């Protein structure tokens, strides 16, 4: 597993379903995120079990991501047509509803490979999350095994920590939350 933190986020152009439901044949990650914060959110497959719980939870937090200037892109190996069918399936019938973020179709597995999150076997993405700054640099990454769902509160906390650090130049100690004091990086300790 590669560590991408501190490196330029791999770019990609693939078919996708945008947050407004529009299907596009050529979604460009770099064009959509230029000058913005971004979260790239890998998940194994549409129409499965843990995945809808994560994607619905992610959508429930979209106002918080949007207010922080964060573009959210979900990625799986499913086609854009399958993504669209899943969006159009009611939640009580196994769907995710009209989520408000882009769903990219990594049908060739190239994005999974570039971000080094492909689980082989079975050839699907691990649950990888990448927080990318406005310069396109990966600042945080976490990769969960297939049965382990993610916590959206922690993802929002990491966005807040990155933005706090960029604004104030201070670091964020363990357990830091928005509104808490930061600290100066110092060899004298805490």
Say what each PLM segment does.
Residues 1-190:
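Chalcogenol-based redox active-site neighborhoods
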């Amino acid at each position: 597993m590669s560590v991408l933190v501190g490196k330029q986020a791999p770019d990609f152009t693939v078919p996708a379903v945008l947050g407004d439901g529009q299907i596009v044949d050529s979604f460009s990650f770099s064009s959509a995120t230029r000058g913005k914060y971004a979260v790239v959110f890998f998940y194994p497959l549409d129409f499965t079990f843990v995945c809808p719980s994560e994607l619905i939870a992610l959508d429930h937090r979209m106002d918080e991501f949007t207010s922080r200037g964060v573009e959210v892109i979900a990625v799986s190996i499913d086609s854009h047509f399958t993504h669209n069918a899943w969006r159009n399936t009611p939640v009580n019938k196994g769907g995710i509803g009209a989520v408000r973020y882009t769903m990219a179709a990594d049908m060739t597995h190239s994005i999974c490979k570039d971000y080094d999150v492909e689980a082989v076997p079975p050839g699907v993405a691990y649950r990888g999350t990448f927080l990318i700054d406005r310069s396109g640099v990966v600042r945080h990454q976490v990769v969960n095994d297939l049965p382990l769902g993610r916590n959206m509160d922690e993802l929002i906390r990491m966005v807040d920590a990155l933005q706090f650090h960029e604004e104030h130049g201070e670091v964020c100690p363990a357990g830091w939350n928005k509104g808490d004091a930061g600290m100066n990086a110092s060899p004298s300790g805490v």
